[in-house]
Structures are given as structure tokens and as C-alpha cells.
Amino acid sequence: MNALVPLLVLTPLFGAALTLTAGRRRRMQIAIASLSMVVSLGVAVALLLAVQTTGQPLVMQVGGWAAPFGISLVVDRLSALMVVITSIVLLAVMVFSIGQGNVDHADEDTEEETPVSIFYPTYLVLAAGVYNAFIAGDLFNLYVGFEILLVASFVLITLGGTVTRIRAGVTYIIVSLVSSVLFLIAIAMIFAATGTVNMATISARVGVLPSEVQLVLHLMLLVGFAIKAALFPLSFWLPDSYPSAPAPVTAVFAGLLTKVGVYAILRTESLIFAANDISVLLMVVAIATMLVGIFGAVAQAGIRRMLSFTLISHIGYMIFGIALGTESGWSATVYYIMHHILVQATLFLVTGLIERVAGTSTITHLGGMLKRAPTVAVLFFIPMLNLGGIPPFSGFLGKVALFIAGAEGTGLAVPQWLVWVGIAAGAITSLLTLYALIRVWNLGFWRELDEVGDVESPLTIVLEEEPDADIVRDERNNSKLMNFATGGLVAVTVALTVFAGPLFTIADQAGENLRDSGAYIQTVTNEEGIKP
């Protein structure tokens, strides 16, 4: 079963190479890309089942090289869950993009947002980068995964070559390069101090370093990952970068790319620097991220920008769980990451559907969507309740699990009073998230079209143009394939609620593995034949 581990990365890379050879032959590119993602999903599910059955991580040493020069690929419960959820989102978004391309391709007057000769190869490279980051067993391979993401995401965010997208791409690439440089410097410092970049081996060796050295290394990694995860105050770039990209690209970015940063923080805090605690700093950052993000969201008139700010705010929930430093906190974080990847990606896809029906996603210019596009209304309503934390959806279950983990007060890495502040911030964030989303529903869906133009609030920030009144739009602007892909993701988000019991069991097991990383360290070091 270990032989399947590298297939997660190799399958999309091989698919990307084949799609390039297909040139502009649309159907061939679609067939190759779709097959690659289906195979990747199958491999991810097989790896999760294998890890669940054996209870032990799967390890592959690429090329047979031992540490510190070898490339370690490791799949434990946490990474297995991440790659399964990732595969579901990537496949659904690809189906959405195919449907969008089919509609645009059939209309000679419409320029495709996802040009076939560029989109599918780059999309598969992006998938390979995400997979590589989730299963990397050493810091340098994690860095390589980040760089693959950086190159592919820059191409995707600038598709179409508009001024807005180029400007967003420049902002994104500059910030990402700063993050990558900090990460690379941290890797060099860790290698100089420990003689390895393998995370399992670092975990065993870092404890003998002076506490000041450990703190510097810890903070260097944290800052690099915090930029990628969009933690306050390093989240300024996200609302200006993500909204400008095509809907499928934005959905993947919002659902997955920031979670790679969160995953790296969780892995760092649980494995590498478990004994060097900076949880108080993390908790303060989590609280600030939740509140600043959601206050930004309620001031937006554009749905894309509003969702970008809610994305930032809900990253705060995950950092809150990590900062608790307990098994229950980490377990709840794992479940919430799964929930947020799916729901956030779904909402951005629905926003893409709204734009194609109404010609805009600015709520001050929207109206009558419930009558014009009832399917889109349903597809928006369910994830709206989910992200807002309405019971019994997974958003509610995940938040409650995080709050209970903090309220337990057992073995916390932060003062109890600070945890209560975090819980209060989380409750406020949940209420304001629901307010922001209900505002979209009331103005965009419930309000009649002839009422559009009323000014709702002087605090509203409008950064989008009015729709072209000469274009007649309705639900036929969306293909059935686009609705099917979005509906599939909505169904999976509902499944997180229906099967919450078994999923929480797996999340609890993942949290237990994170708290007691001995099995991870032993499996990796034994596989390499090295001494910790």
C-alpha cells in the first residue's frame, strides 16, 4: 500500500503533461484531466482506508535516499483526511469548469474564463502541489509543494490577462514570495541546528537546542505559514487577490490554499515544536483574525469580497483549536478544516452561478434571484446556513466542538480567561457571518428585481461594476453540469452532518495521533533506518 503514496503527486503531474500534448483539443484535455482527478480521488480513499485499518502511517522514501537528503512522503490520518477532502473539491471544481467552458465555448460572443489550453494543465499542477504539501514528511519537500502551488496559482489567478487580475496576481506573487523566502530561511536554520529537514527527526532533535534558538526557529516557521494561511495581520493580501480570479479558481484557492498553511501550522505545533509553546500568541492571533475578518465581511457589498473576509475570519476558528494545545482541540480543528474546505469552496462556486445569471455579484445590484434562478437559490441557502453555524449543520457541530474543547479547561496551553475571550469572539464571528450571508439572501434573492437601487447602508463598500442592462440573463446561463458540480459539493457538506459521528471518530483518532506523535516518528525513522 505504501507504493500508492507517491501516486497522489505523480498522477496529476502525469495528467498535466498529457494535457499539454493534447494542445487545443478540448475534449481530449477534459478527458485526461477528469481521469487524473478520478484516479487521484480513488488513491486518496484507498490510502485513508489503509491508514484506518492499520492505524499506522504509510511512508515512502522516494528514490531510496535516507535522511537528511531523502524525500519522505508520509500519510497518517490527518493527511489522509486532507487529501480525500481535497480530491472531492478538486474533482467538483473541475466538473464546474467543464460546464462553464461548455457554455462559453458554445457562445461565440463569450470569451472563456478558463481557456482550455492553459487551465487544465495548470490546474493539475496545482493539484499535485496541494497533495505534495499534505503528504510531505520533510520541510524541504513541503517547501517544494508550496512553490508548485505558487507557480500554478499565479497562472490561474491571472487567466484572461485583465488589468484587475494582473494586479491581483502581482500582489499575490509578491506576498507568496516573501512567505517562501522566510520559510526557506527557516529550513536552512533548522538544518544547520539539527542536521536534518525530516520533520520526524527534527522532533526528536530540536529539544536539545537552547530555548532561545527553538523560539527563533519556531517563530520563523510560524510567520511563513501565517502568511499562507492568511492570519491577521498578514491577511491583507487575500481580499484583493482571490475575488478577481475566475469562479472555479477562486473556489479552489479559498477552499484549499489557505488550509495548506493551516495544516502546516498544525503539523508544526503538534510534531516539531510540541515542547516549545507559543500558544498564547496563537490564541491572540486567532481572536484578532476572527474579529477583524468578520468586521471586514459585513462592510462589503460584493459577495466575493465578503466571502474572502469570512474566509479569513473562519481561519481564526482553526487557529483557536490549534492554540488550545489539547487532543480535543486538535480533533475539533481537524473536523472544522474539513467542513470549511467544502463549504467555502461551495459558496464561491454558487457565487459564480449568481454572476452568470445576474451579471454581477454586488448585492446592491442584485434582486429577484429566487424567481430567476431557484436552483441557485437552493444551492446558496444550504451552505449559507452551514457556514453561519445553524444547527444541525457541520458548521454548528464544528464550532460547538471547538468551544467545548476550550471550556473543558483540562490541559490547556493557554490561560482559561483567554480561552473564554476566544469563545466569545467565535460566537460573535458566527453571528456576524450569519448576518452577512442573510443580507445577501434578503437583497439578492428575496428582494424583487424592481427594488434594486435602494441604498442599504453608508458603511457598505462597493467595488464592483453594475451589470450590463442590455444582456438578458436567467438560469439558462448556467449549464446543468455547473449546477450538478455545485449540488454535489452541497450534498457532501450535508453528508458531513449526516455522518458526523463516524467523521468525528476519525477526527478524534487524528487528534490522538497528533497528541501522541510517537507512532509517526517511529514509523518514519524506522523506515529510513536512522537514529533520532
Regions found by a protein language model. Name each.
Residues 57-77, 409, 413-417, 523-527, ...:
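Interfacial loop/helix-cap signal at membrane boundaries in integral membrane proteins
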Residues 92-102, 106, 125-140, 153-394, ...:
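Hydrophobic transmembrane alpha-helices and their helix-loop junctions in integral membrane proteins
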Residues 363-364, 370-377, 437-532:
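Cytoplasmic/organellar membrane-interface segments at the starts of transmembrane helices
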Residues 2-4, 18-121, 200-204, 509, ...:
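Transmembrane helix-loop-helix hairpins at membrane boundaries of multipass inner-membrane proteins
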Residues 52-65, 192-203, 357-358, 400, ...:
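Peri-membrane helix termini and adjoining interfacial loops of integral membrane proteins
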Residues 27-38, 167-177, 373-379, 480-488:
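Alpha-helical transmembrane segments and their helix-start/interface "positive-inside/aromatic belt" motifs
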Residues 42-54, 184-191, 390-391, 496, ...:
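C-terminal TM-helix exit segments that contain a strictly Trp-centered aromatic cap at the helix terminus
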Residues 7-26, 223, 230:
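N-terminal signal-anchor/start-transfer transmembrane helix
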